[in-house]
Regions:
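Short, acidic/charged, Gly/Pro-enriched secondary-structure junctions
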Residues: 93-117
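Oligomerization/assembly interface segments of phage tail-like spikes and tubes
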Residues: 68-90, 138-150
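Short acidic, glycine/tyrosine-flanked loop/strand segments centered on an H-E-D-like triad
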Residues: 79-83, 110-129
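Short alpha-helical segments and helix-capping/turn motifs at coil-helix boundaries
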Residues: 89-92, 130-131
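Solvent-exposed edge beta-strands and adjacent loop segments
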Residues: 3-4, 9-79, 123-136
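Compact mixed alphabeta submodule
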Residues: 118-150
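A general structural signal for short secondary-structure junctions and capping/turn motifs
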Residues: 72, 95-97, 107, 134-138
Length: 150
């Protein structure tokens, strides 16, 4: 059966850290034909530009697995939570375009791993705020949530 397990897992070394270093956005569909081998993207035939955002602190990626025994379905909900400090008119414009589209999102961790969110269906902005903050130490910037179901 194609769903049978093929391996186990030993307890890994404690040599990793949490957090996201950078986020890269590619407009939906610009990747062209994507070749995936062994759960890794090995090639993309499209001509594309990626737009990089540096992040630090309150940004994360979480993948939720949803299975239905009754329906025989399984899908993966990928949720990216981002915090961008400092409100700017340039960012207002770009984040509005991001909310209108459904980009592919590449999440680069502090461990050097890069994970793709929304490879097949893109990622939608499902929530966000532009906040000035109330106190001197509060966030003046943006929070954004992108969600992909694959």
């Amino acid at each position: 059966m194609a769903c049978d397990l093929t391996g186990g897992r030993l307890r890994p070394c404690k040599d990793v850290v949490g957090g996201i270093r950078q986020i890269h956005f590619v407009n939906y569909g610009d990747l062209g034909t994507v070749t995936v081998a062994d759960d890794q993207i090995t090639d993309a035939s499209g001509t594309f530009t990626y737009y990089t955002y540096d992040v630090k602190g309150n940004s994360s990626l979480e993948t939720n697995i949803t299975s239905s025994i009754d329906n025989g379905t399984t899908y993966f909900e990928q949720v990216v939570n981002l915090t961008f400090p400092k409100l700017t008119k340039e960012d207002n414009k770009e984040l509005k375009l991001m909310a209108y589209g459904r980009p592919h999102v590449f999440v680069e961790t502090y461990n050097g791993d890069v994970m793709c969110v929304g490879l097949e269906n893109g990622a939608d902005v499902t929530a966000g705020t532009a906040v000035t903050g109330a106190a001197m130490g509060d966030l003046n910037g943006y929070t954004l949530t992108l969600t992909a179901n694959e």
